[in-house]
Structures are given as structure tokens and as C-alpha cells.
Swiss-Prot record:
Belongs to the antenna complex beta subunit family. Pfam families: LHC. NCBIfam families: pufB_517_ASD. Residues 2-27 are cytoplasmic. One of its GO terms (cellular component) is plasma membrane. InterPro entries: Antenna_a/b, Antenna_beta_CS, Antenna_beta_dom_sf, LHB-1/5, Light-harvesting_complex. Keywords: Antenna complex, Bacteriochlorophyll, Cell inner membrane, Cell membrane, Chlorophyll, Chromophore, Light-harvesting polypeptide, Magnesium, Membrane, Metal-binding, Signal-anchor, Transmembrane, Transmembrane helix. Antenna complexes are light-harvesting systems, which transfer the excitation energy to the reaction centers. A bacteriochlorophyll binds at residues 21, 39. PROSITE patterns: ANTENNA_COMP_BETA. It is a single-pass type II membrane protein. It comes from Cereibacter sphaeroides (strain ATCC 17023 / DSM 158 / JCM 6121 / CCUG 31486 / LMG 2827 / NBRC 12203 / NCIMB 8253 / ATH 2.4.1.) (Rhodobacter sphaeroides). This is Light-harvesting protein B-875 beta chain. The core complex is formed by different alpha and beta chains, binding bacteriochlorophyll molecules, and arranged most probably in tetrameric structures disposed around the reaction center. The non-pigmented gamma chains may constitute additional components.
Length: 49
């Protein structure tokens, strides 16, 4: 277990916080890619301007 002085205000160690951040960013990139593909598909199907 991490010592109290090693924990940030979130209760995570620096290593855990970096791992959580990398997982979060991977999910954000995946969500963004799916959203872009969906918008392009809808625009090709029915342009909105």
C-alpha cells in the first residue's frame, strides 16, 4: 500500500494516475474517431448545408 505522503488529493499514486489518464485518453480518442466517422457518414447520406 502506498504511504499517505505518496498519494495526491485523489488518493492515487502518481503511477496509478498516469495509468488512469492513459486509459481515459485512449477512450477519448476512440469516441472522437467514432463521432467523426458517424458525422461523415451522415453528411454523405444527407448533407446539412
Amino acid at each position: 500500500m502506498a504511504d499517505k505522503s505518496d498519494l495526491g488529493y485523489t488518493g492515487l499514486t502518481d503511477e496509478q494516475a498516469q495509468e488512469l489518464h492513459s486509459v481515459y485518453m485512449s477512450g477519448l480518442w476512440l469516441f472522437s474517431a467514432v463521432a467523426i466517422v458517424a458525422h461523415l457518414a451522415v453528411y454523405i447520406w444527407r448533407p446539412w448545408f
